[in-house]
Amino acid sequence: MSETQNTQVAKRQRTLVGKVVSNKMDKTVVVLVERRVKHPIFGKIIMRSAKYKAHDESNQYNEGDTVEIAEGRPISRSKAWRVVRLVEAARVI
C-alpha cells in the first residue's frame, strides 16, 4: 500500500421531504417538515414540525407542493438547503 494514497469518503447528504408553505420570497421557499416522535413519558406518538428555507433557483414551486430538499453549503444567513425535486404537485381546486 502506498502512503501517499488519499482516500476520501463521500459524506451522505441529508435529505428531507416536506410541504411548501410560502413562496413569497425571491428564489426561496419555506418548507414545513413534519416527523412523528414517541413521547418519552406517555408513549403517545406526536407530530413535531420544523420550517426550513430552501433555495429555488427558478421560482417554480408553489404553496402546497410536496418537495424534497437537501442540505448543502450556506447560501445566505438563514438558507442552507436547496430544493432537489418535486415529489407531488399541489391540487388545484
Curated annotation (Swiss-Prot):
Gene Ontology BP, a term: translation
One GO CC term on file: cytosolic small ribosomal subunit
SUPFAM superfamilies found in the cross-reference section: Nucleic acid-binding proteins (SSF50249)
Swiss-Prot/TrEMBL keywords: Ribonucleoprotein, Ribosomal protein, RNA-binding, rRNA-binding
CDD domains in the cross-refs: Ribosomal_uS17 (cd00364)
GO molecular function terms attached to this record: rRNA binding; structural constituent of ribosome
Keyword rRNA-binding: yes
Assembly with partners or alone: Part of the 30S ribosomal subunit.
Family membership noted in the UniProt record: Belongs to the universal ribosomal protein uS17 family.
NCBIfam families documented for this protein: PRK05610.1, uS17_bact
Protein role: One of the primary rRNA binding proteins, it binds specifically to the 5'-end of 16S ribosomal RNA.
Name under which the protein is recorded: Small ribosomal subunit protein uS17
